[in-house]
Each structure stands twice: as structure tokens, then as C-alpha cells.
From Swiss-Prot:
The active site is at residue 123. GO terms for cellular component: tRNA methyltransferase complex. Belongs to the class I-like SAM-binding methyltransferase superfamily. TrmB family. PROSITE patterns: SAM_MT_TRMB. It comes from Mycoplasma mycoides subsp. mycoides SC (strain CCUG 32753 / NCTC 10114 / PG1). The gene is trmB. S-adenosyl-L-methionine binds at residues 43, 68, 123. This is tRNA (guanine-N(7)-)-methyltransferase. Substrate binds at residues 127, 159, 199-202.
């Protein structure tokens, strides 16, 4: 997501560096980062942090990482997360943020690092010439398969018809994934809505009567 530069975020991130992951050209050791062996989940494009903060508060024995390209957005998300944990009188020990690009995930993390990956309302990159930048392009699907455990899951949500169709096409180009949920109208499916956690964008789009797609795929390696 795009967000105008906020002058306070750099200082805020420096003051709260404990909650940030820094990549120094070595594989990131998640056990060292979280000081436990709990399952770890990754949200690629964590936005203002509503989704991953809600997950982390609901599942204190699972580790979560929110990844964004923009340090400004990360600052906004981290501030929100810390406030939500404080409001519930809980220490934020299972949620970290970091800035980087999805292209670099295999360099930063070892194989089988994550139990689940979330892609929520990623940039659809609508121009045809930009199709390789879409986060469900087959190159990215291969990266996710590498860093995800066998039989781990990737959850994808979008309101964009073209990105949904593109994602299905890309999944048909690889044998590393099995589609286990393909909801073409999430909010008319009570079964899939039971445990649904909406993002900021999702709430906005749903209130505007936009259709929401959800795909869940299992990593076959």
C-alpha cells in the first residue's frame, strides 16, 4: 500500500528496534529472533497492521512477522500493534516487523521457515507489462514454496477480478501447490467467514459492496 511519508516514523522505529528484524546478508534465525520454537507465520504486505495484530493477539503461542516495503507503513503498523497489545495488557513478544521485498525472501530465510503465509489485497499491477511484479506470479509461488514447510498453507485474498484470475492461471503452471479453498464470493460463504479476520482494505471494499475472493493453497513441495 502507498502512504505519504510521515516524519515521526523513522525516530519511532529507531526507538522500538526490538520489534524489528534486520537483514545483514545472513539467513535470519527465527529461533534467535523470537527465543522459542513456536510456529511462525508471515504476512507479505502487512499494511497498517490490523490483520496481523489481531492474529498475534489471538494466538500468543504462534510467532508472526509483518513485511512491508515502506518504512513509513511499518512505523504506522508497529505503533498500532503496540497500542493494541497494551490495551489488552499483553506484552508483544510474538510479533515482529521488517522492511524488504518478496523477491529476496529465499535469500533471507531458510527452507521450511514458515508454517503459513498470508497475501492480503496485494497490488494487482494491472498493466500487462508488469505481470511479473504480481505477488502470485509463478516465480513468487516457487519462493513461497521453498520457505514454507511441507503441507503448510498460503492464504490469499483480493477484491481484484483480474488478479484472482491471474493467480488461478499461475497455480495451474506449477505442481507445488494444491488448491484447498477457492471462494469466489467470500462474504456469501458462512463456512469460510467463521474464522475470517478482515484487513483495513477488506472492510472498506466489503462496505462498498465489492466482491472478495479467497484462495487457500497447500504446499506440496
Amino acid at each position: 500500500m502507498r502512504l505519504r511519508k510521515k516524519n515521526w516514523t523513522d525516530d519511532f522505529l529507531n526507538q522500538h528496534s526490538f520489534y524489528l528484524i534486520n537483514y545483514n546478508n545472513k539467513k535470519i534465525d527465527l529461533k534467535q529472533i523470537f527465543l522459542n520454537n513456536n510456529p511462525t507465520c508471515l504476512e507479505i504486505g502487512s499494511g497498517k497492521g490490523q490483520f496481523i495484530t489481531t492474529l498475534a493477539l489471538k494466538n500468543l503461542n504462534t510467532n508472526y512477522i509483518g513485511m512491508e516495503k515502506s518504512s513509513t507503513i511499518t512505523g504506522v503498523a508497529l505503533k498500532k500493534s503496540l497500542k493494541e497489545f497494551e490495551n489488552q495488557l499483553k506484552d508483544m513478544t510474538n510479533l515482529k516487523y521488517f522492511n524488504n521485498f518478496a523477491e529476496d525472501l529465499s535469500q533471507m530465510f531458510s527452507s521450511d521457515s514458515f508454517n503459513k503465509i498470508y497475501l492480503n489485497f496485494s497490488d494487482p499491477w494491472p498493466k500487462t507489462r508488469h505481470y511479473k511484479k504480481r505477488l502470485t506470479y509463478v516465480k513468487f509461488l516457487d519462493i513461497y514454496s521453498d520457505i514454507l514447510i511441507k503441507n503448510g498453507y498460503l492464504e490469499f485474498k483480493t477484491d481484484n477480478d483480474s488478479l484472482y484470475n491471474f493467480t488461478i492461471e499461475q497455480l495451474n503452471l506449477t505442481n507445488k501447490w494444491e488448491i484447498v479453498i477457492n471462494a469466489t464470493d467470500l462474504y456469501n460463504n458462512t463456512e469460510f467467514l467463521k474464522d475470517n479476520i478482515p484487513t483495513e482494505y477488506e472492510t472498506k471494499f466489503h462496505l462498498a459492496n465489492k466482491n472478495i475472493y479467497k484462495i487457500v493453497i497447500k504446499n506440496l513441495k
